[in-house]
Amino acid sequence: MAYVPAPGYQPTYNPTLPYKRPIPGGLSVGMSIYIQGIAKDNMRRFHVNFAVGQDEGADIAFHFNPRFDGWDKVVFNTMQSGQWGKEEKKKSMPFQKGHHFELVFMVMSEHYKVVVNGTPFYEYGHRLPLQMVTHLQVDGDLELQSINFLGGQPAASQYPGTMTIPAYPSAGYNPPQMNSLPVMAGPPIFNPPVPYVGTLQGGLTARRTIIIKGYVLPTAKNLIINFKVGSTGDIAFHMNPRIGDCVVRNSYMNGSWGSEERKIPYNPFGAGQFFDLSIRCGTDRFKVFANGQHLFDFSHRFQAFQRVDMLEIKGDITLSYVQI
């Protein structure tokens, strides 16, 4: 079953290195780039480049370069006409060898804002117009799990915060037919606290997609995601991943739990790992994708699913991004 990304949300899972690909729609204020991966045990350095074109020797608007070399630091720079500019550096290393990480670049009007594992790390002022940037390059001593482009204007004013996600970018990308695209209603929330309760404005509708990105704590036992009717407490869809075991699905209606569903091809929730969930509401079922792979379907038991107006997330996790 093919994974259909939501509008404005462009993920690539398990890309190979070196990664050199166009930025969908080009770089613009308000865009965020999420990079999830693992720093290798023998890591010495890696880099992320925001490049002006795909050719060798192309200008690099922003060079991000963590270095484990006895003087652990992160170097920032710009290259124009084959010449590097003045280095900026921070003598602090937010990455740990052998550990998962989440690296976020937020494109602001005056600078790039770098966030590592949910903590703001650095701001790098634009030396080249960001509109010139066309490609993202990643290489070095790391393993990539996913790269996500969250696109467009208007700009987010701060981190955490919100920004509006527009429709699919057009340049360099041919989207599926419009009738196959999920509909996303609300702005994304960055780094919301756990437990999280969000309001589904207008209720749950067919073809609406919920995106949840987070991190399973190393000591985690489980987490819970509920699609609820606020006025009654009914739970149309209860999803309960149990770390190292199974993913339980159920519903709670009229004061009683229904029959559990547990069968899945694999459990994508591991202690100390990031996850990327896409939950799409259809006319007769929920479709759940984890890290771009179909995980399971859950048929509607609560037929008036349009009355579902709350999303509840709790458990042994941190959240980096929720789009409702």
UniProtKB/Swiss-Prot annotation:
Ranges for domain Galectin: 19-150, 196-324
Keyword tags: Lectin, Phosphoprotein, Repeat
Phosphoserine found at: 259
Protein name per UniProt: Galectin-4
A GO-annotated cellular component: extracellular space
Gene: Lgals4
Function of the protein: Galectin that binds lactose and a related range of sugars.
PANTHER family in the cross-refs: GALECTIN, GALECTIN-4
